[in-house]
């Protein structure tokens, strides 16, 4: 996505720069404890899940990521297939639930409730109704007494489960969240995010989390603004690598063993105004409502115009395919959820679907394309006491990450998940 929006009211402006004096991190739900006050102890390994939004695996080959490459050499790695659509919110929810978007319900970054009972879903939506079809791993862990903390992750601010409060406008009673969580705020720098995680781990064992998430958005932002092959993406990758080094140094200073799992949600493809498909040249405006556009588009026919829409979308453009939702090819594992629009049109990788031709030329990057395309591949590195060193795995699907995390935390195997821990069984100690 172009920039991860605030989970409640904060939205990110494209290409926004960080302030020279960032605001202090909002208070966590438990105060940090200084190292001096901690008794000597043998620390139980923690699991840290890190998302570097929009980081393609081949960014590791640019010579600017020594810390990531060191972890790769000391652990296991692979190119990972995202779920379709290769967008931020659907894939972040897949990573922590083990379900494809069609089953967990976050089928796009922007959605409409087909019943009309709820306002449209946007990047700021925290109404549990949208999220509660699948249980994220921090909820499973908290239910079993494992303390968790999230330093930004889509959906981690949402109250999971519980009973809707009458007249509460989406508020619930008796819900579960991570014990410590942060409302997303782009002005919180990468250094502050890392330091907050280290502060959590500095606590005594009774209040120290055993599962932590950490999220970085700058590589994705640079990819959208300047394209995946740009110097700006290389600079952003170098800075995130520096932050990974800051984290590992902090863990070493605490003598804190950690199984670190580093992922991205999707890759990035170069885009240009010379590769656009204008829907106003395919459909009469009165025939349909156009939803999200870009690498793919959702289309809802106007009542009574279904036949006209079906005919127009039968062979719409040499660089775009369209399907009625019940005829989307099975390999996408998409189309069964009622939140998916009646028609989905998918552009060829690098092409953009727009409502009308742009008035000004543009270039940059985007994602949301066929999840099996090479440009959409995601990053995977895992290193720590649970993993053997220096093993390269075959490509696997990101639905397998949640089962891996369950193994690391000692949680029961999930029932009815779309993924499994099979890719990792031979490379874990």
Question: Language-model segments: which ranges?
Answer:
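Positively charged n-region of N-terminal signal peptides that target proteins for export
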Residues: 1-4
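Active-site nucleophile/metal-coordination loop of metallo-enzymes that catalyze phosphate/sulfate
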Residues: 22-44, 56-144, 159-161
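Loop/turn elements at helix/coil->beta-strand transitions in domains of secreted/extracellular proteins
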Residues: 43-47, 74-77, 103, 143-149, ...
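Structural recognition of the beta-strand scaffold that forms the well-ordered cores
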Residues: 47-51, 78-81, 94-96, 139-140, ...
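Metal-dependent active-site segment of extracytoplasmic phospho-/sulfohydrolases and closely related
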Residues: 49, 67, 239-279
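His/Asp/Glu-rich, glycine-adjacent segments
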Residues: 99-227, 354
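Active-site neighborhoods of enzymes that stabilize oxyanions during catalysis
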Residues: 291-404
